């Protein structure tokens, strides 16, 4: 998911704590001194810039106060222990008016757009004069860049044919005021180092595991947002993430990675050390099985995607295509651009995005937030209702027919917000038991004259291309796949070496049923506005036809030298 129009590998991240040394989440009343400084300097600068020949009509300041702790261990030893604290502001200035401003796409030369925002480092303390000086310099620079960009925009608009989508460049939204608690944490790093050593140690027992690590990241982010329309937002969040990964290699040189992830915002939702060690050993067992698993040739036929795999599938091939900014871009494929009010999925499926949800069942969702990165209140959005496309995920850059944001303008700190996904949920009115779904898979394989169907049990991520310049296709990267034979007496067979490929409209049309048990994918999605936390939940999907291709394969053989024997500890 690095860029939705380019390779965009999902970087799954997770959070964990254990008994005795859990990171402690601390919430306190918001310190509004930083917000007061931002507001004062913003108003001072806005009063001057709105009087210029090409006047500024909008300014926003976002201050992020961040602290991060990252611990990494591999094969029973600590690799790194890093602590950081930083504070910075992102300055946006818009010149022109709500209908046409400096952010308007320049058709035929996207490189001519220039920078939209300026990121500037700030003191980590609330020293007013240094902060104001930094904001003043950044605002002046951003205004000059915006003024030059508006000149290019007006020239481009005059020289090109009339646009298909004449929507305004910026939506008018109601000012919001919200002052939430700020967040911080305390962490016993030494205790966690010992814990990560123990969790990572089992991988040293297998000499064919070439790379492995266990990483813990604990991050706090206190955000202060204000704009010239009167919006003032203060929010604070802490995220604890733990990531277990290991890589082995088959005899033919194919690298076989596996990942396990956990996420929580407080210790109460996190597994203990015993469970984590058990998960690490289960991963080792699966790696050993994968080394011996046969390769699969390119195949076209029926398949089941597990709930988690289906979540990634929908995130990649559906979610990116309903982000409104892709409907504005003339270079985008605009898969659903003119399909509002029309069927785009089977009638038994609905898709919602709900950033207001903190949990689904007992699982915390990474895509939760109260206000988006443009200061708009988060809300539940039903994008597809019983198969019919109803709307898009909209930020403050409207598209034809949708003139207001629905709270999905998102960005990694320091980037320009665009419409992005939050907590995706696939809902089905045609669900069956796991046993019935497997029977339906076998029946579909028999009908097509296939000896087996496929079960995609786990997916590490994927990428999708939504542009017009190349195939409007997706590539999803499974790492645990089984053959399900039409003969029910034959056990499922673990296989390796395939990627799931296809085009979106064809794939959606071939979903024929779903299972009952909903599973959840939590991860970081990267696109134009950087990496943002998301989740995707779905029941298992039965698809009448999928296509798989051979996975890219390393030509480097396994090591010739034997691995050193494990050191006996007295």
Question: Where in the sequence are the language-model features?
Answer:
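Short clusters of small/polar residues that mark proteolytic maturation junctions
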Residues: 258-260, 394, 495-499
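Local beta-strand/beta-hairpin segments that build beta-sheet-rich folds
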Residues: 383, 390, 493-495
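C-terminal, non-catalytic macromolecule-binding modules
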Residues: 388-444
